[in-house]
Amino acid sequence: MPTRRGFIKCLAGIGAGVLPWYGWPELLKNAIPQAVQASIQTSNSIKTTVNSVPQNDQTYLNRTAIDDILALTHSELQGRRAGTVGEEKAAAYLIDQMRGLGLEPLGDLMDNNNHNYLNAFTVYPVVEEFYYGRLTFRPGNPDDLRTPSANVIGGFMGTNPNESVILSAHYDHLGIFHGNLYPGANDNASGVGCILDVMRRLIKEGVKPNRNVVLAFWSAEEMGFVGSYSFVQKPTFSRTGIEAVFNVDTVGNGPLEEFALWANSDNKAVQAVQSAAAENKASVALTPNNGYNSDQVYFNMDHVPAVTLMAWDWLNKNHTPEDVLDFVNPQKITLASDILYRAVQKLVF
């Protein structure tokens, strides 16, 4: 999680058309490492309609958040730094999961007027530095060439296709620095696995929601929430129809039933999470962010009810090479997923 508000302002002028996307389409075809492919079964793209529950592959429905964390922290993904081949491989994994679950692509429009899963933008170069023992990024030379990056977005379409609730998590991390791999298991493969689990559960139930449930995997969060900022500035579906955003970040560590919430007010998203947490006998406190932030921030600035759910002890081992799979508590991921599932239910059914 970045700490510098100046960095956010520096990135505010980004656009998706600055750098051609020569590498992404071909790389995405072969991006999933063989070691990860061994645990999944690729399916063809499955189209959905507004009148049906997504058609899906049971293999994908049976996966778990821990499976997702294992895949995303694989060494071949090189820490998932935005603008790298590792990020592309992570995006390919997420697209494969969305296709397998039968989610409708909700990214950028293509030439045939259909949507892609990818939502493109570019990032400025950055310089690495340590801040109180945590590896962070600060802005590099803004005159240097920008690098392509992408959010990954898909949805379980509801009976009212003009209204949506977003479940989001950033999938990027810090990459490799000075020969050290930063796997980012808790930050934020845990959040990615958590919201995928919620979507699997919703689809398994086979009940079409009243509102769309959108999965949005943001990239370049570690560089200043660039992916979510880009989406807020140029959404790929109706901005006025976004009822709430439930963002999940670093949710898998610390005491089992203790969570924190970040938001700019006691909005409907906050209230839904607090109510759902009470049903699970968990503690979720709306807390000051103390200079830190996450991807709810630009939605809040744009007057969209949005909240970030995170572990109370999220800073422990954050942005260090020790943020590995063994650091994540599967029981806490399960609890967080159930809280989010109940919160989403309150707004989409």
Residue ranges, per PLM feature:
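N-terminal hydrophobic or amphipathic helices/low-complexity stretches enriched
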Residues: A31-L109, F156-M157
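Extracytoplasmic/secreted proteins, especially bacterial periplasmic and envelope-associated proteins
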Residues: T64-D67, A71, V85-Q97, N116, ...
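Alpha-helical metal-binding/catalytic segments enriched in His/Glu/Asp
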Residues: L167-H173, F177-M223, L340
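A non-catalytic alpha/beta surface segment that caps or lines the substrate-entry region
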Residues: R80-G155
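N-terminal secretory signal peptides and thylakoid transit peptides that target proteins
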Residues: M1-G15
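His/Asp/Glu-rich mid-to-C-terminal helical/loop segments that flank catalytic regions of hydrolases
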Residues: N316-F349
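Metal-dependent peptidase/peptidase-like ectodomains
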Residues: W218-K317
